[in-house]
Amino acid sequence: MKKTLLWMLAAILTCSGLTTTLTSCKDYDDDETIEVKEYFTSWNKCEALTALKEYVEDVTNPKSPNYISPEDRIATFDMDGTFVGELYPSYFEYNLLEYRVLDDATYRDKAPDDVREAAQAIRDFVRNGKALPDHFDMIHAQAAAKAYAGMTLAQFDAYVKAYAARPANGFTGMTYGQSFYKPMLEVFDYLKANGFTYYVVSGSDRFICRSLVESIGIPSNRVIGMDVKLVSSKQGEEAGVNYTMGQKEDLIRTDELIIKNLKTNKVLQISQEIGKVPVLSFGNSSGDQAMHNYCLSNDKYRSAAFMLIADDEARDHANREKALNLGQKWNAAGYHVISMRDDFKTIYGLGVQKVEFTF
């Protein structure tokens, strides 16, 4: 009798939906289907999307010879221009340094000459079209290290988020902190649902990246970027190996650049921090080629690499001719090309429109 009551109770719970979230307790006709989440609603049908879905379906199928176990489903994503805007009018971290050095009343009078020169080069580039100096990625990195030196990590996070809350220059209906490519966020959702772990591997400052992607649920321990040396707030000049940090000390940014995370440095950081070769890689520039090639050299698993091209002059501040030339280059290198103009139904979402820059 007790067994009968237990079975009846289990049936009632099942029918009430407490033990399942997929169906109610009923028979389905042959033509009825269970609702499944639809991904990629912001995409048009295109080669790149077809290739991505075919790849994921293959490597997640236990019966496939290309099956990849979940712990090895590693995907790496560049940030600027790959899933975050970079044409408003330049990289977020370039805009931030320009503001910090030339407009922020709390710092502009303190900026060293070389930092001021770097910020002015950015302003001349975005406002007057003057070419940036050679090797400006390193010039900027060294200037940025100095410009934010002395800030605690909490102070820097708040500073980045305050600037990110400003309206994105060249657009209406969007702040810098909202400037994510909606179709690429759907890629994150799709990969997560299929057992992939994805990492941000950016040339931008690691802590800037962390502040920006927090809002879309990417944890800070899956963010790799440019690094500066940190010290404890009471450490002074003593080496970390000799100093014991106390319980109520903060971590402070210094002016010492450790690494600019571009090109082969991305590969080195992936190896050191992730410890596995990615099977999927997404980027948009030559700074991502080494990461892509590392992924495609994976001799254990089938792999794939994707490059976005900024070819949409109607919805973004793009250079279509330059983008198409890059697309040919990426195709020749064996990467799948994602056209923002042809493949995306929307870039930033409804209500966002491109307008002229204002300075």
Which residues are covered by each model-predicted region?
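Alpha-helical substrate-recognition element adjacent to the catalytic core
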Residues: 32-239
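Bacterial Sec-dependent N-terminal signal peptides
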Residues: 15-35
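Short, flexible segments with low predicted structural confidence
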Residues: 4-5, 127-128, 263-264
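Bacterial N-terminal signal peptides that target proteins for export
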Residues: 1-9
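C-terminal cap/substrate-recognition subdomain and adjoining C-terminal extension
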Residues: 32-40, 154-359
